């Protein structure tokens, strides 16, 4: 069993981005600029946002955090987004999710200019990604692809089972791995927590790669996978004792794995790295550098 070290991979990707940014600065261009909007106080969101801003510094970017109280109205937040959309010095915009209940999340996602939507959630980017066209790919799914690529895990022609159908992870990773592009051409089965148990077991036990994102601690157990499987655990769950665990029963499942991601230290780092890649792409688009 070997670990798919997201920290090591992310640091390599961000260092490569920093070298490119240094070259652009030497030619007289400004730094890439990411803006993150955080509404209200939500401990996990605070942690995610801090890691994004820190990674901006490591990549040579400018990172701006805009905080708003959870009393902000949807109309007020939309107005803030329109202002950032019109700002030529901001390349990428993230609105940290989740949002307060009185704000329609999809309205906010749809309001972000597609050319600044580095999360890859806007329908325009999601549609282009689905069609295999150039787009900002959803960051967690893109990060998983980059992790597989970094460790040279074969994907072409492999049987991949995705557990979880969210628009953030499950759906985009199933599309990306089945598309004909640099890390794809797998045969993908998309399952979820409503998939009948026996059907789920039938699929996972035949899978070469299992990717799970359901938010249930220890959901994937040793009996669900075959020898030599590659397991990607997207889950981040905090237990009552404060311990952070994934959706995989790590200590038992790892016995059968050829490769497995740890939690923490796996996919989370790759999500942030993918946001840096998308921000660089937005910046390059703005200056016609690609």
Curated annotation (Swiss-Prot):
InterPro entries registered for this protein in UniProt: Aminoacid_DH-like_N_sf, NAD(P)-bd_dom_sf, THF_DH/CycHdrlase, THF_DH/CycHdrlase_cat_dom, THF_DH/CycHdrlase_CS, THF_DH/CycHdrlase_NAD-bd_dom
Pathway of action: One-carbon metabolism; tetrahydrofolate interconversion
GO molecular function: methenyltetrahydrofolate cyclohydrolase activity; methylenetetrahydrofolate dehydrogenase (NADP+) activity
Catalytic activity of the protein: (6R)-5,10-methylene-5,6,7,8-tetrahydrofolate + NADP(+) = (6R)-5,10-methenyltetrahydrofolate + NADPH; (6R)-5,10-methenyltetrahydrofolate + H2O = (6R)-10-formyltetrahydrofolate + H(+)
Gene Ontology CC annotation, any one: cytosol
Cross-referenced PROSITE patterns: THF_DHG_CYH_1
Keywords on record: Amino-acid biosynthesis, Histidine biosynthesis, Hydrolase, Methionine biosynthesis, Multifunctional enzyme, NADP, One-carbon metabolism, Oxidoreductase, Purine biosynthesis
Secretion signal span: none
The name this protein goes by in its record: Bifunctional protein FolD 1
Upper lineage: Bacteria, Pseudomonadati, Thermodesulfobacteriota, Desulfuromonadia, Geobacterales
